[in-house]
Design a protein with these regions (language model features):
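Generic beta-strand structural signal
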Residues: 1-2, 133
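Basic, amphipathic "hinge/linker" alpha-helix immediately C-terminal to the N-terminal HTH DNA-binding motif
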Residues: 5-24
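Amphipathic alpha-helical dimerization/coiled-coil segments
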Residues: 25-69
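Electropositive, surface-exposed helix/loop patches at the edges of structured domains
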Residues: 44, 48, 146, 166
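Mid-protein regulatory/catalytic core that forms ligand/cofactor-binding pockets
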Residues: 51-158
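Short, charged, intrinsically disordered terminal tails
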Residues: 156-166
Length: 166
C-alpha cells in the first residue's frame, strides 16, 4: 500500500489479475454467445468458471470463440481498450446520439438492474439519443427509436459511450 492508501500490484500480481479478468470475460462471452444464457445472468456463472478452467482450456476456448475483444457487457479483454473518446452516459448532452460501449462491472452484480438495462436496450452496441436532463431529479431521458426512458445519473455514470452521428 502506498502513501495514498492505494494498493499497487507487482508485475506478477498484474499478470495474475489480467489472467483472472480474461478468464472471467471469456467465460461470460462463451456463456452468453455460445450457450445462450441471458446477458444479465452470465456474470454470476462466470465467477465460478473463471477459477475452474485450466490454461489449456482457456487457450482452446479463446481460439474456439475467435478471440473476442470484449465480454457481452462491453468490458475489453486484457490487451484491448475502450476508444479514447469514450465518456460516461451521464456526460452526454441533450440531443447527442451515443453508442453504448460498456456497462461497468459494478452494475453486473445486480441481475435486476441488468434486466432493466436489457429491456431498455442499454447494452453494448446500441445507439440512443439523449433527450433531456432533469438535474432536480438527478436523471436523464434517452430515446431509442420510439421508446423513451428515464435513467438516473447514478446508473448513467457507469455506462461508457461514444458520440456517433445520427
Amino acid at each position: 500500500m502506498d502513501d495514498k492508501k492505494e494498493i499497487n500490484l507487482t508485475k506478477e500480481g498484474e499478470r495474475l489479475a489480467c489472467d483472472i479478468a480474461f478468464r472471467h470475460n471469456l467465460a461470460e462471452y462463451f456463456l452468453c454467445n455460445t450457450l445462450g444464457i441471458p446477458w444479465y445472468e452470465v456474470h454470476k456463472h462466470a465467477h465460478q468458471l473463471e477459477h475452474a478452467t485450466t490454461p489449456t482450456v482457456v487457450d482452446k476456448l479463446a481460439a474456439f470463440l475467435n478471440y473476442p475483444e470484449t465480454c457481452p457487457h462491453g468490458t475489453p479483454m486484457p490487451g484491448h481498450s475502450l476508444p479514447e473518446d469514450c465518456s460516461t452516459l451521464d456526460q452526454a448532452e441533450e440531443g447527442m446520439m451515443v453508442e453504448i460501449m460498456m456497462i461497468i462491472e459494478e452494475l453486473e452484480d445486480s441481475e435486476e438492474l441488468l434486466k432493466i438495462l436489457q429491456t431498455q436496450q442499454l447494452i453494448s452496441g446500441q445507439k440512443h439519443q439523449m433527450i433531456s436532463r432533469a438535474y432536480v431529479m438527478s436523471s436523464m431521458t434517452r430515446q431509442q427509436e420510439e421508446q423513451q426512458a428515464i435513467l438516473p445519473f447514478h446508473v448513467a455514470d457507469k455506462i461508457h459511450v461514444v458520440q456517433v452521428e445520427d
